Amino acid sequence: MSLALIAERYESDVDQLPQTHSELGGGAARAASGLVYENLIERTCEELALDARKNDYKRTEEVNGACLKNLQVDKHIYRNSVMVKAVESKCYLDSCYLKRAVMDFIELEQSPEVPEWVEYAIFAGQNACGNDAFVYYKAFFKKMTGKEVKIFFVNPSRKRSSSRSIYNEQYREDFKLDSVVYNEFVEWLKK
């Protein structure tokens, strides 16, 4: 499937969300809207000959003799069986999701099972995060790891409004795929 067809599939998946909402309710529509972005990442990786893994659990570093074995984000991306990227996916990114993603990325960065060259990104439709939290958590990640966390907002209405949901047909244009940002994400994956 070409990248153009993958983008068309994204649009088709978003077009189905109002029906999901009317037939199955808000919870099902919210779950389906999250999958729209995860599926876009997965299909894009497939096209680029990358392996986007879900439930690819890693071990945390040991602290005072304790260690967790369930560390993961939405997609651990492999090239030639070697982990190269970690991506958290959100329909919209609020400060709670940003904080959690940054903390998970820091733990991944410190994991003995994650190569030191792994890069980190958040792939989201819209931004629901206040500016202070947005600036702080990006800076905190840099302070703790020495690395940048990339954040891609792929919908043209980058600022979220809770009254303009993705599964409301009236606001469909807010959720078109921004091809410029999507292509930036593709180029980042290729690096």
Language-model regions: role of each:
Residues 1-54, 63:
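Interdomain/boundary linker segments immediately adjacent to catalytic/signaling cores
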Residues 33-41, 68, 94-98, 178:
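Phosphate/oxyanion-binding active-site loops and adjacent basic polyanion-contact surfaces
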Residues 41-49, 105-112, 141, 189:
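Hydrophobic, Leu/Ile/Phe/Ala-enriched alpha-helical segments that form helix-helix packing faces
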Residues 46-53, 78-83, 111-115:
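Secondary-structure boundary elements
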Residues 54-74:
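Long amphipathic alpha-helical segments with strong coiled-coil/leucine-zipper propensity
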Residues 82-85, 89-144:
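Catalytic cores of nucleic-acid endonucleases
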